[in-house]
């Protein structure tokens, strides 16, 4: 690994730890040339799952798009970045467990909605309004009544 400070490739790993439920390895390194410390993160290369968009075009699955969408939905809410990261991880795990080649964007959206419903109801409504392209207030009222019905069914 090249040192980000002196660009030497002479470094030593001082500590390794797993992070993000074991899907990431965090390594603390010491450059043997300039003696400065830096940290690297190793994670599994995304499997070759392709996303099938509504116009039938395909693109590689990108967890960062999901994360950005959830961050927008959770903006100014009492949801920590750690909770967002864990939610994205659960979504990614669900996708990789069920799909090995292609996944429609509609399916990704539904998985995200299911996870957001348990994370934060306002974030769920915000995401749903964009994902389902709400036209007017009745769309919002419908989703709120669905949330209330589900909460009563689950005894919340």
Swiss-Prot record:
> Which BP terms from GO are recorded?
negative regulation of DNA-templated transcription
| One Pfam family in the UniProt entry | ATP-cone
Which keywords, in A-to-Z order, does the entry hold? ATP-binding, DNA-binding, Metal-binding, Nucleotide-binding, Repressor, Transcription, Transcription regulation, Zinc, Zinc-finger
Instruction: Supply one GO molecular-function term.
Output: ATP binding
Superkingdom of the organism of origin: Bacteria
Q: Where are the transmembrane segments?
A: none
Start and end residues of each ATP-cone domain: 49-139
| Cofactor binding mode and count | Binds 1 zinc ion.
What InterPro entries does the record point to? ATP-cone_dom, NrdR-like_N, RNR_NrdR-like
Q: Which cofactor does it need?
A: Zn(2+)
What ranges of residues constitute the unnamed zinc fingers? 3-34
Q: What does this protein do?
A: Negatively regulates transcription of bacterial ribonucleotide reductase nrd genes and operons by binding to NrdR-boxes.
HAMAP family listed in its UniProt record = NrdR
Its family?
Answer: Belongs to the NrdR family.
Which NCBIfam families does its entry note? transcriptional regulator NrdR
Entry protein name: Transcriptional repressor NrdR
Q: Which organism is it from?
A: Rhodopirellula baltica (strain DSM 10527 / NCIMB 13988 / SH1)
What gene is behind this protein?
Answer: nrdR
């Amino acid at each position: 690994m090249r040192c980000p400070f002196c660009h030497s490739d002479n470094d030593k790993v001082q500590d390794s730890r797993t992070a993000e439920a074991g899907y990431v390895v965090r390594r603390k390194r010491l450059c043997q040339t300039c003696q400065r410390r830096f940290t690297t993160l190793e994670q599994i290369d995304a499997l070759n799952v392709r996303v099938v968009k509504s116009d039938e075009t395909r693109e590689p699955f990108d967890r960062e798009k999901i994360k950005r969408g959830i961050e927008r939905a959770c903006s100014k809410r009492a949801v920590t970045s750690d909770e967002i990261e864990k939610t994205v991880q659960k979504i990614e795990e669900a996708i990789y467990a069920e799909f090995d080649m292609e996944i429609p964007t509609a399916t990704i959206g539904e998985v995200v909605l299911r996870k957001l419903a348990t994370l934060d109801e306002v974030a769920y409504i915000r995401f749903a309004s964009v994902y389902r392209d709400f036209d007017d207030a009745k769309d919002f009222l419908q989703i709120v009544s669905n949330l209330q019905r589900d909460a009563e069914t689950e005894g919340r």
